[in-house]
């Protein structure tokens, strides 16, 4: 698929944290080995390459911390998923320096939008409500995510692909910080349900507290 194309944009990934905790091996195969194979293909054919990654490679921030992630924030992944994405980012940087590939990297906040996989937070809650199942919320629902619509994400990726500097990393966010309980209650109210009509469940291991993006570089 690589020969004859202007660029490769690598969106593909295993990306659900719960699944990575239950079975990390597919994440290693897809996110690390898959990236390696694409890098070798673009090295062979000299094609421009953009690598789509996640802000989760930076770990998390305290709920009361006013700071945001920047391109200079040290990597500190805290889950099997985020560690494989951090590894794939490092592969891109190494292949860029060693082989002179024309690459860029973007680390984006949490996406939402049409046709998103049902394993993700927003479509899972919507699907549960439609199916008559009470939504479930981890911990105290205090975990904060910086939400961005998929169209805004893709628009930013296009800008990086067409205007970005080779070897650079760009953070993509939308200043859309909300904690999980707020998002769930918004969904319940939008669907005509009682905003308290959900169940609390035990928090997952290593659940990141807060993500926040400083995307001023874009």
Question: Which ranges hold each PLM region?
Answer:
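A conserved pocket-lining segment of Rossmann-fold NAD(P)-dependent short-chain dehydrogenase/reductase
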Residues: 19-20, 72-76, 101-114, 125-148, ...
């Amino acid at each position: 698929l690589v020969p004859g194309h202007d660029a490769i944009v690598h969106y593909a990934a295993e990306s659900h944290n719960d699944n990575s905790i239950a079975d990390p091996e597919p994440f290693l195969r897809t996110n690390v080995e898959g990236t390696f194979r694409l890098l070798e293909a673009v090295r062979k054919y000299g094609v421009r390459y953009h690598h789509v990654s996640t802000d989760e490679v930076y770990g998390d921030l305290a709920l009361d911390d006013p700071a945001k992630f920047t391109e200079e924030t040290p990597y500190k992944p805290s889950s099997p998923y985020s560690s494989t994405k951090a590894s794939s980012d490092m592969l891109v940087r190494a292949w860029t320096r060693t082989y002179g590939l024309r690459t860029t990297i973007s680390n984006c906040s949490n996406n939402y939008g049409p046709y998103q996989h049902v394993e993700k937070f927003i479509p899972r809650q919507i699907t549960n409500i439609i199916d008559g199942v009470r939504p479930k919320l981890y911990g105290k629902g205090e975990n904060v995510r910086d939400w961005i619509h998929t169209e805004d994400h893709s628009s930013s990726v296009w800008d990086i692909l067409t205007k970005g500097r080779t070897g650079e990393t760009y953070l993509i966010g939308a200043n859309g910080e909300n904690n999980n309980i707020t998002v769930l209650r918004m969904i319940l109210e939008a669907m005509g349900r009682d905003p308290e009509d959900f169940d609390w469940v035990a928090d997952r291991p290593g659940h990141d507290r807060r993500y926040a993006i400083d995307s001023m570089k874009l």
